[in-house]
A protein has these predicted regions:
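Short, acidic, metal-binding catalytic loop of nucleotide-sugar glycosyltransferases
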Residues: 25-33
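Conserved donor NDP-sugar-binding/catalytic core segment of glycosyltransferases
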Residues: 98-127
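Short aromatic/hydrophobic "clamp" motif used to bind/position activated sugar donors
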Residues: 84
Length: 137
């Protein structure tokens, strides 16, 4: 998996209750090197302060509130990785998400512009999973 550098762009607005877990799930990835970019749409809570306090390596960018698409595009422009991934600030990844995607792209020598993984949804119980999903943490 040589030559893969992934920048993860996390757009956010007023997500202090979720964003730390989202970034923790990125930081815990088995695949490295990573660049984590938080693009804050001018939150009115202390989202950016909490991220800066708990995750010193996260690059924090602030822009006036323009919506999630503008935040993603801003993050892409500021990214240094040769691959870009997105995670919404109220979501989390399995610890091997990027590893499995990079393996698949490398193994099949893909020049993919898009890679998608199955989702697992929880709310007091398991609502959906794929047979291929590894649910161990």
């Amino acid at each position: 998996m040589e030559g893969f550098n992934v920048s993860v762009v996390v757009p956010t607005f007023n997500r202090v209750d979720f964003v730390l877990e989202a970034i923790k799930s990125i930081s815990s990835q088995t695949f490295q090197p990573l660049e984590i970019i938080l693009v804050d749409n001018n939150s009115e809570d202390n989202t950016t302060e909490m991220v800066a306090k708990h995750f010193k390596s996260v690059k924090i960018l602030i822009q006036k509130k323009q919506g999630v698409s503008a935040a993603r595009n801003f993050g892409i422009r500021e990214a240094s990785g040769n691959w870009i991934a997105f995670l919404d600030s109220d979501d989390q990844w399995h610890k091997r998400k990027l590893e499995e995607q990079v393996k698949s792209i490398s193994r099949d020598k893909l020049s993919a512009d898009l890679s998608h993984t199955d989702e697992i949804w929880y709310r007091n119980c398991l609502l959906y999973t794929s047979d291929a999903a590894d649910e161990t943490t």
